[in-house]
Amino acid sequence: MEEIITPLKRAFADTFAMYLKTQYYHWNVEGPDFYQYHELFGTIYEEVYGAVDPFAEQIRAQLAYAPGSFKRLSELTRIVDEETVPTALAMAERLLADNTLVLMSVKEARDAADKYGENGLVNFLEDRLDNHKKHAWFLRSAIKRV
């Protein structure tokens, strides 16, 4: 059912893109707060990575194929690719913005699943929303200027 599959694939692509960007930042962060950002980005990318395979399996459970090529994922995602190495603070700010996009796409997929009574999928997506709300909290706290 395309009404579920289309937003589900977008949410998957946004999740995968956020995972890649977060790991990229984890590898390349520098500066006086290196360790704190390195650990924060590591915590986030590990959690998001853990969702990639179950997300793909949810797409397969809908009798669709999970997107797997970088070309297709880049067509689906709203997250902008990173080609530079920004400051640690800018990394956290960009991840917060990207996480907001993931929250939006997961909510859209959840709403579609709910509309069609796909309760198991709704539960999975609600769990994803909870995790991304926690990531938003961590990132907001890391960039807050006291």
Which residues does each predicted region cover?
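Acidic/histidine-rich alpha-helical segments that form the ligand environment
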Residues: 53, 57, 76-126
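Disorder-to-helix initiation segments
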Residues: 1-11, 81, 88
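Generic structural signal for well-ordered, non-transmembrane alpha-helical segments
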Residues: 9, 13-16, 42, 46-53, ...
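Conserved alpha-helical segments that form or flank metal/cofactor-binding pockets of metalloenzymes
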Residues: 33-72, 142
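Heptad-repeat coiled-coil alpha-helices
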Residues: 24, 28-31, 61, 68, ...
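Short, contiguous alpha-helical
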Residues: 123-146
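Non-transmembrane, amphipathic alpha-helical segments
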Residues: 3, 7, 40, 91-94, ...
